[in-house]
From Swiss-Prot:
InterPro entries: Ribosomal_uL10 (IPR001790), Ribosomal_uL10-like_sf (IPR043141), Ribosomal_uL10_bac (IPR022973), Ribosomal_uL10_bac_type (IPR047865), Ribosomal_uL10_CS_bac (IPR002363)
Family matches, as NCBIfam families: PRK00099.1-1
Protein name, entry field: Large ribosomal subunit protein uL10
SUBUNIT field: Part of the ribosomal stalk of the 50S ribosomal subunit. The N-terminus interacts with L11 and the large rRNA to form the base of the stalk. The C-terminus forms an elongated spine to which L12 dimers bind in a sequential fashion forming a multimeric L10(L12)X complex.
Name of encoding gene: rplJ
Function statement: Forms part of the ribosomal stalk, playing a central role in the interaction of the ribosome with GTP-bound translation factors.
Any one of the GO CC terms: large ribosomal subunit
Keywords: Ribonucleoprotein, Ribosomal protein, RNA-binding, rRNA-binding
Coiled coil start-end: none
Native organism: Baumannia cicadellinicola subsp. Homalodisca coagulata
Stored PROSITE patterns: RIBOSOMAL_L10 (PS01109)
Example of a GO biological process term: translation
Gene3D superfamilies the UniProt entry points to: 3.30.70.1730, 6.10.250.2350
GO molecular function: large ribosomal subunit rRNA binding; structural constituent of ribosome
Length: 166
């Protein structure tokens, strides 16, 4: 179905607003993946704050102008799916990485985070970023561990001090 100029402009405007508010983006080649599989992937993405789109590469170049994702322009070759993360920077990378494990034809091309491009081989760096809840839990654990360590050192010092005075 051919899009007229007004429809193309509407798509670019709508997706550009979304892209400007996104935290990260992941680009993938979806050749060989069925429509039903892509639909399931999109549904899973919506649950974790990931918006996926498939548009012509020329429109995608217009969409990413003046966004932190301009570094991805070289990856828009062939059938391209782009996933934008809005709630957590690693959500799209994690989702597409897990999808690619089960679908060998699905190929992650690259990702962008804070204006820097990550090659597909380094997608784990983005996918393994802890969520906000995980980071808070880890910080609390480290603070508790530090307090327990201080208490243990204090008790050992008191025991040593008492044994020296006795």
């Amino acid at each position: 179905m051919a899009l007229n100029l007004q429809n193309k402009q509407a798509i670019v405007t709508k997706v550009k607003e979304f892209a400007k508010s996104a935290l990260s983006a992941v680009v993938a080649d979806y050749r060989g993946i069925t429509v039903n599989e892509i639909t399931e992937l999109r549904k899973a993405g919506l649950k974790v704050g990931v918006k996926m789109i498939v548009v012509r590469n020329t429109l995608m170049l217009r969409i990413i102008e003046n966004t932190p994702f301009l570094c991805l322009k070289e990856t828009f070759i062939g059938p391209t799916l782009i996933a934008f993360s809005t709630e957590h920077p690693g959500a799209a990378a994690r989702l597409l990485k897990n999808f690619a494990k089960n679908h060998k034809k699905f190929n992650i091309k690259a990702a962008a985070f804070e204006g820097a491009i990550l090659a597909a081989s380094h997608i784990d760096q983005l996918a393994n970023l802890p969520t906000y809840e995980e980071a808070v839990a880890k910080m609390i654990y480290l603070m508790k561990e530090a307090a327990i360590g201080k208490l243990a050192r204090l008790l050992v010092a008191l025991r040593n001090q008492k044994s020296e005075t006795a």
